[in-house]
């Protein structure tokens, strides 16, 4: 079995080794199972006692059952080796799987590109509308400041005249009230001097 487990280098020899292992394991399972069935048959005439024959048959059945289990494990190992062989040496299948995966990724990339282009167009349209709204509102606010020079000068004169007209009454109001304020001033008498003389 150890010589059968050694994996040759060439693919052809390796496949032949796999085939031989498969046949040997299947033959081992069939032979041991057949012998177990034969052992289960009860014989009438035996050279040894029935108890001794029973113990011998029991031991033989255990050994052959262990051989069947070992052959089954060998088949499972063979399946694992075949999978590894196909993965490492089946280049057409590997290339086909790689090409299929590349096609899936390219389709996904194209779909992402289309979505990004659509999103870019929508953002551009919204940005353009926002710019138009911003500049239109800014221009309406700046129309009052963007007047011609003569009109701006005329408005400046009007503002100056209105300011002068408002300040003139404020300046004149103290003069009109000066007379009564002066006439109402109290007369201070000198305590040590003579009082006012009366002229006749």
Swiss-Prot record:
GO molecular function: transcription coregulator activity
Keyword match Nucleotidyltransferase: no
Annotated Pfam families: Med22
Chain positions covered by the region annotation Disordered: 167-200
GO annotation, cellular component aspect: core mediator complex; mediator complex; nucleus
Compositionally biased intervals (Gly residues): 190-200
Keywords assigned: Activator, Coiled coil, Nucleus, Transcription, Transcription regulation
Compartments where found: Nucleus
Coiled coil: 93-122
Bridged cysteine pairs (disulfide): none
Residues of the signal peptide: none
GO biological process per UniProt: regulation of transcription by RNA polymerase II
Subunit structure: Component of the Mediator complex, which is composed of MED1, MED4, MED6, MED7, MED8, MED9, MED10, MED11, MED12, MED13, MED13L, MED14, MED15, MED16, MED17, MED18, MED19, MED20, MED21, MED22, MED23, MED24, MED25, MED26, MED27, MED29, MED30, MED31, CCNC, CDK8 and CDC2L6/CDK11. The MED12, MED13, CCNC and CDK8 subunits form a distinct module termed the CDK8 module. Mediator containing the CDK8 module is less active than Mediator lacking this module in supporting transcriptional activation.
Protein role: Component of the Mediator complex, a coactivator involved in the regulated transcription of nearly all RNA polymerase II-dependent genes. Mediator functions as a bridge to convey information from gene-specific regulatory proteins to the basal RNA polymerase II transcription machinery. Mediator is recruited to promoters by direct interactions with regulatory proteins and serves as a scaffold for the assembly of a functional preinitiation complex with RNA polymerase II and the general transcription factors.
Family statement: Belongs to the Mediator complex subunit 22 family.
Name of the protein in its database record: Mediator of RNA polymerase II transcription subunit 22
Source species of the chain: Rattus norvegicus (Rat)
